[in-house]
Amino acid sequence: MSLFDHSLTKLHELLAAKEINVSDLVDVSYKRIADVDSKVKAFLTLDEERARDLAKKLDEVDASEKGVLFGMPIGIKDNIVTKGLRTTCSSKILENFDPIYDATVVTKLRGAETVTIGKINMDEFAMGSSNENSAFQVTTNPWNTDYVPGGSSGGSAAAVAAGEVPFALGSDTGGSIRQPAAYCGVVGLKPTYGRVSRYGLVAFASSLDQIGPITRTVEDNAYLLEAIAGHCPADSTSADLPVPPYRESLTGEIKGLRIGVPSEYIGDGVSEEMRKAVFDALNVLEKEGAVWEEVSLPYSKYALAAYYVIASSEASANLARFDGVRYGYRTDNADNLLDMYKNTRAEGFGDEVKRRIMLGTFALSSGYYDAYYKKAQQVRTLIKKDFDDVFTNYDVIIGPTTPTPAFKIGAKTDDPLTMYANDILTIPVNLAGVPALSLPCGFKDGLPLGLQIIGKHFDEATIYRVADVYEKATNFSKEKPSL
């Protein structure tokens, strides 16, 4: 049994009782990475020397006087900047980028005295649903290494599922925390837009991006969100609201809780095993005292199209900063300034990033702005209204995280539209800005299935309460892959 099979609370108790020390935890992490990462390929850069030095210092501290995250090893998705630790966004254009500052979430974690183990693989600039778009390596699913771990935070989900770290940070623009969490059988939360600072998150789509926690259990997830959430003066979109003690929301009580189940989330395109897993989960929650009814989110059918117009348009603007002048890769193949811009971007960006930049530039161009970008934003407003209407009568919305379990590596790389459809059930949440969590709810042919719980704006606490009740009434979160 690995130390990382324990909850954060239990690990903290062991530290406080001096039965283990921080160096033991760091040792477990690096040993596990050495043992299995040649198969999983989750980590891009390890920070071993600094991590071990910090662990030795923390060994001298009385853990009983510290918070639950004290001394805990963590992995950071490679689009979250870390001072003095390479941050690549899994792109050749940032292959040797060494940030001069920490993201706000990293600063908060350092304040909580966690230990950063290293930076984790992802789809390039967070654009992808399978982790196959990384310029450096393809992360695999620990449950079956022939299958994808999901994307774009597939490396973070795989690292946690494989027991390399007890928890990790990811980012979610259209499902990039929840979909990998579902595929890898772990717990992943996309917080309300504005709940967690984006300062230091390399921007993909600024109105959609949100950093969130990926963990083994719901309780661990609540602890990690509490540590990273809160207002940040450096991020004008972060909400100036108090951060609730999320761990205290895990009361075990959901009697009378009202659940809405969108008919659009359990209809055509959703596999039979996924549909059955959702209804089985609803039966579990019903026995615990909740009530559920079918509801409708009619504009969800337009979410995928609206998302790819909005996200690509914002990416087109955000990625204009990677030009070979200020930082990152610069081509050697240029006779003049214009050639330098063109060739740097042509050589530095991968195919999917180029595809989205082109799509976004087209949608923002003169003559097409009203027809595409403006219309997509109008659809976004209608999608948000759908959620608002349902939440007037219901506490949470529940459905599958993904239409199917994970697919084989290489199965969809030649068909971008089929790949995009993997996020059809997660994208509406980002467009509406509401929080949502995925947690394990079953297996099909040895691959995990994910249940998605969606909450009201800034009501992550209710999501955690429901998820915790379900997790404790089932055994799915206790299952581990055998690597």
Swiss-Prot record:
Protein biosynthesis listed as a keyword: yes
Molecular function (Gene Ontology), one example: ATP binding
Record-linked Pfam families: Amidase
Enzyme Commission designation: 6.3.5.7
Signal peptide feature range: none
Phosphoprotein among keywords: no
Catalytic activity: L-glutamyl-tRNA(Gln) + L-glutamine + ATP + H2O = L-glutaminyl-tRNA(Gln) + L-glutamate + ADP + phosphate + H(+)
One cellular component (GO) term of this entry: glutamyl-tRNA(Gln) amidotransferase complex
Assigned keywords, A-Z: ATP-binding, Ligase, Nucleotide-binding, Protein biosynthesis
GO biological process: translation
Active-site residue list: K77 (charge relay system), S152 (charge relay system), S176 (acyl-ester intermediate)
InterPro entries in UniProt: Amidase, Amidase_CS, Amidase_dom, AS_sf, GatA
Subunit relationships: Heterotrimer of A, B and C subunits.
Record's function text: Allows the formation of correctly charged Gln-tRNA(Gln) through the transamidation of misacylated Glu-tRNA(Gln) in organisms which lack glutaminyl-tRNA synthetase. The reaction takes place in the presence of glutamine and ATP through an activated gamma-phospho-Glu-tRNA(Gln).
Similarity section: Belongs to the amidase family. GatA subfamily.
Protein name: Glutamyl-tRNA(Gln) amidotransferase subunit A
